[in-house]
Structure formats: C-alpha cells, structure tokens
C-alpha cells in the first residue's frame, strides 16, 4: 500500500537518525561506502537519459544549462558529480548538519562554486505555490530517498510541482520483497554491517509496480526501470535484469496540454480525463 497520510515527506525519526551520521558522508570506507560506489551506475544513468532528452550542451560539461534538484542530498555525494558535468544543481535536505557537511566539502573544489548550491529545506517547502522552486527544474533526483519518506503521494506531487513540463524524475530505491528484506536489512544491517542497524524499514520499501502506478496517476510517464545489484565482496554495483532488490527508475513529467473543457479549466474531472488520455492514448 502506498503511504499517503501525513502530507509531509519528512519522517522525524529519519531526521534524527541521519543527524547522527551527518559528519560521516565523505568517508568512502564508512557507513556510506555503498552510496559512493553507487555513483558508478546512477551518475551515467542520469547523464545519459538527460542527454537523450536534451542533447549535449558542451564538451566536458554535457549537462551545462540544465537545472537539477537533488532531493535528500545528504552530504552531496551525488550532487557534486552532477555539478562537475556542468549542471546547475541545488541539493536540499531537512538535516541541517548534512547540508553543512556538503557545503564545506564543495567549497574545497573551485569548479563547483558556481553551479552547486545547498539548502536545508524540505521538498514541500520548496514546491509551495509561488515558491522559488515551482516549475524551475529540468530534473529531480531522489536517490536512496523514497524508502525514508513519510508520504510518497506528497513527494510525487511536489516533484511534479517543481519540474518543468517534460522534466525528468530519477529515483533509485529498494523493492518490497522477501529477498530485499533478507539482503537489504538482515544481511546488510545485521550480518555484514554495510549500513548501520535500523537504517531501513521494510514497510517503507515500494515495488516498481506500485511506484509506477503512483507516478502515472500524478502526471508522469515512466520511461524505464532497471535492476541494480550490489556486490559486498567487491563493494561495487552492476546492472541486472532483476528488480527484486534495488532498482532505478526514470520518469518524465507530462507536457502541459490545452484543457478539454474550455468553459471550466479548473474542473477536476477534466484534469483526470486529460491524465487518462495522455497515459492510454499517447
């Protein structure tokens, strides 16, 4: 069942948990080692899909001219490499100490100072009507984030709000299967200690089918879903046909279209009809 009750994306317990880890983000052999190595998959996944949509902008800086929002950026592990590809990246996180860690680390790289910024703010605060984030971004990235959220429905609506029409949403997360429980929680947290105990809650995991259904009912079209596999012996990630544990998803916000009912453009039945038409007949 999709979580939708709190109307906020932030779970206070998750904030407390990550507050304790805020100074550990850039230890490549520490609690976030698997996220560091995940960049080998997720950075090309984001880059290549954006290039397919927008084309190359500049040699060496292929994402130049694109605005990307990194939701739940933590210490900036993914924000920085996207910035090095030329994108104008805003990393946001509700944990202020994590933002502080990200800012300090980015400050040491002169190449990032002009196009990587951070804010200690929630997604819903950024996306509020009339806010600075509304309709401003070419892409939203939420990598290893949705399994920590309080409300997926609110998250989806907020992502739609901040994206430009035709903008991309990139998600990596964990499937809700018995295998994911055994490997992502029992093995990773309790046996191998790859991540701290208590990092994940299986009840918050979401299957690709559920996530796709939620996105496509809220103004997105899912373009692709790919399975990801972590090898704890080598500390590396690889693509796999199976999505039973980890997976990456790319969705696109539907382009704005003329209203079907010119007399009442605010009629919710018209909005629903438009969404269905786009989904089933495009």
Spell out what each predicted region is.
Residues 37-64:
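Conserved alpha-helix/loop element of class I SAM-dependent methyltransferases that forms part
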Residues 193-210:
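Acceptor-substrate binding/catalytic loop of class I
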Residues 208, 212-221:
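Substrate-binding/catalytic lobe of Class I Rossmann-like enzymes that use SAM or dcSAM, i.e.
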Residues 220-231:
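Conserved S-adenosyl-L-methionine
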Residues 180-190:
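Short, flexible, mixed-charge acidic loops at enzyme active sites
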Residues 2-32:
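N-terminal, positively charged/glycine-rich alpha-helical extensions of SAM-dependent methyltransferases
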Residues 236-282:
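Core SAM-dependent methyltransferase catalytic element
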Residues 57-61, 66-181, 208-211, 249-251:
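Conserved SAM-binding loop
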